[in-house]
Each structure stands twice: as structure tokens, then as C-alpha cells.
Regions:
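Hydrophobic h-region of N-terminal signal peptides that target proteins for export
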Residues: 1-8
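Structural preference for beta-rich elements and adjacent junctions enriched in aromatics
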Residues: 9-338
């Protein structure tokens, strides 16, 4: 039996000259249907925001194609709509890949929901409809290997669509997958990005100055979030595994009758005690249900490092990650367990 309790704290900081997007709650309107078409009346509650600037290759310059997005929310979900203009829709690069593959054209939305300039939750969707997600820590320090943790795999929903203007995407993100404070009216950090594959071009909503010290601390602001109710997250993933072994029976031996059966079970659970305190629980875990590790052969005396993907060990694992000198070191390597 393994139990983990994770807590969070929220910080306040002064408002800078960053961009501000103001969202609105869906009150009387029906929530958007996630079909990628952007036709639901709820989207009319708020305007699009745009004016993206290049991050690569020509920082600060106008991108080849502009991008728009808007955000609405209700008491359980936050909804994001993207409009990605493209003068040559047939040239949009759509590549299927595994989760977190980031192949072809894609867009990303990231929320610093604690407004602490240190951590953020990132959601990416490719033009082909492939999802990617990362938990960002350490202010998104690109020099640290573990600042962008793609082993974080929350539950959320998305759909994309292509038309004569380019391509669109809709995202539906449960508030239970995010961590935020208890203030009646909240300010979150906000960043949106687009990757235009044909030009290997990245553009951003909140422009970053050259050599800006950090990533999350340079986010814009998301305002208009009012009366967000604490989400009592409850996720239970039970499993049952059966095994049947057959062999040649032995006459007169009741213990060798030709077959043996085995039954095994357990569960993983994530329970939200409060909105910023989560209990992770695993009982008799079957770690064989997680993605298989890539094949590797060790020809020296050093242990091979494998990425952690087991749900129990993923939550807030950056606590045990430290940078010493020019390297990234783990005080605790969870893959030695199980």
C-alpha cells in the first residue's frame, strides 16, 4: 500500500505590462460541443485575441500566418477555441503520432493557474488531432531536463477541423485536472503558441523579450475567472488480470489436471481532498499496464535511466529534482520501486 499527499500554495505578485485576456462564464448558454467547428453560441460570449509574434526563427517579427484563440468556462470545465489561419490549407501538415509526439502543425495553451511564475499546465493539440500535455516547473528553465514533464497525462478532450481558412481546434479541460487557489476572483498566467511546420516557425501570444530569464514568468494574464468551485477530483482505475496456464495432465494427480488459473486485481486512485491537496493511492499496482520502456542494452556499469510513467509516481515528482552544477540529478529515482 503506497500513499502520497501533494499540497500546493499560491503566491501573489505585482501586475506587469503583460497582455491580458478576459474570459466569461457560461451562464445561460449551453456548453460548446467539442467538434472543432467553433459554431456554438457560447463562443460568442467573448472575442478572439490574436497578435502573435515569432519566437523562432525571427524573434519579435510577424508570423507567416496569424492565430486567434478565445476562452470560456463553466463550473466544471475551461474551454479553448483556436483559429489557425493558413493561406494554403492543403499544405497543413497532419501527422499521426503517439501522445506527446508534437508532429506537424500544432497549437498549445498553457495556464499558470497559481500565478506563481514558476509552474504551469500545458495542453497541445496537433492539426491531426494528437494530444500532448506537460507539467512545467522551475519557470520552464530550458536548460533543465525535467522542467517540462510530459509523463503528466491528464484527462481532457479535443477535436480539430480543417476548412478554407486554415484549421481550428477546440479543447475541453476539466478544472479538476488543474490546481488553483480559493480566491473569489482569480488571475492566472496565460500563454498560447503555434508551430507552423512548413517554416519551422514558432509564434507566441505573449511575446518574450530576447534572453528573457525564464518562461512561465513571462506569461500574459487570464482574467475574468470568478467563483470557481473547488473540484473534488475522484479518479479510480481498477484492474483485473487473469492468467491461464495449460500443460499435459498427470493421471491420478489432482494438482496436475492440465490447466491452472490465476486471478489478480488492484487499483490506482487519485482523490482530491481540497482543490490544492491531492491524495494518490495505489493498492497492489500492476505496473505492466503502463507503456513499455524502449529497448536498451547496458554495456557499462551504469544504470539505465528510464522515464517514469506510472500514475502514482508522476504527481509532482519534480519535488525530487535538483540541478547540481551543469547536470540534472534525482534525489529519488522511483523506477527502482516495483
Amino acid at each position: 500500500l503506497l500513499i502520497s499527499i501533494t499540497g500546493y500554495t499560491q503566491q501573489n505578485h505585482s501586475v506587469n505590462t503583460s497582455k491580458v485576456y478576459t474570459t466569461r462564464a457560461i451562464d445561460t448558454q449551453e456548453a460548446p460541443v467539442i467538434d472543432g467547428l467553433l459554431k456554438d453560441p457560447a463562443w460568442d460570449l467573448v472575442p478572439f485575441t490574436s497578435d502573435f509574434k515569432q519566437l523562432q526563427p525571427d524573434i519579435g517579427e510577424e508570423p507567416t500566418e496569424q492565430t486567434q484563440f478565445k476562452i470560456v468556462y463553466d463550473d466544471k470545465y475551461i474551454y479553448v477555441a483556436f483559429r489557425c489561419f493558413d493561406s494554403d490549407p492543403d499544405g497543413i501538415v497532419k501527422r499521426l503520432s503517439r501522445r506527446d509526439g508534437f508532429e506537424g502543425d500544432w497549437v498549445e495553451i498553457a495556464f499558470d493557474s497559481y500565478n506563481d511564475d514558476r509552474t504551469a499546465f500545458s495542453f497541445t493539440i496537433t492539426a491531426a488531432g494528437v494530444k500532448g500535455d506537460e507539467f512545467i516547473s522551475n519557470n520552464g528553465d530550458f536548460s533543465e531536463r525535467n522542467s517540462f514533464d510530459d509523463s503528466w497525462n491528464p484527462i481532457w478532450y479535443t477535436k480539430t477541423n480543417s476548412d478554407d481558412l486554415g484549421w481550428t481546434a477546440e479543447l475541453k479541460i476539466p478544472l479538476s485536472q488543474l490546481r488553483f487557489g480559493k480566491a473569489e476572483e482569480q488571475i492566472w498566467g496565460l500563454q498560447a503558441k503555434r508551430f507552423y511546420f512548413r517554416n519551422t516557425e514558432r509564434s507566441m501570444w505573449q511575446e518574450l523579450e530576447p534572453n528573457f530569464p525564464g518562461y512561465v514568468s513571462g506569461f500574459g494574464e487570464l482574467r475574468g475567472l470568478k467563483n470557481l468551485k473547488p473540484q473534488k477530483q475522484l479518479e479510480i482505475q481498477p484492474y483485473v488480470v487473469t492468467q491461464l496456464d495449460t500443460y499435459e495432465a498427470q493421471a491420478g494427480n489432482p494438482f496436475r489436471d492440465g490447466n491452472d488459473t490465476k486471478l489478480n486485481g488492484g487499483l490506482d486512485a487519485k482523490i482530491g481532498i481540497t482543490n490544492d491537496l491531492t491524495l494518490d493511492l495505489t493498492i497492489n499496482p500492476d505496473f505492466g499496464q503502463v507503456d513499455a520502456d524502449p529497448a536498451a542494452i547496458a554495456l557499462d556499469g551504469f544504470q539505465i535511466f528510464f522515464q517514469e510513467r506510472r500514475p502514482f509516481f508522476v504527481e509532482n515528482k519534480n519535488i525530487f529534482t535538483y540541478e547540481i552544477g551543469n547536470g540534472n540529478d534525482n534525489v529519488f529515482y522511483s523506477r527502482r520501486i516495483g
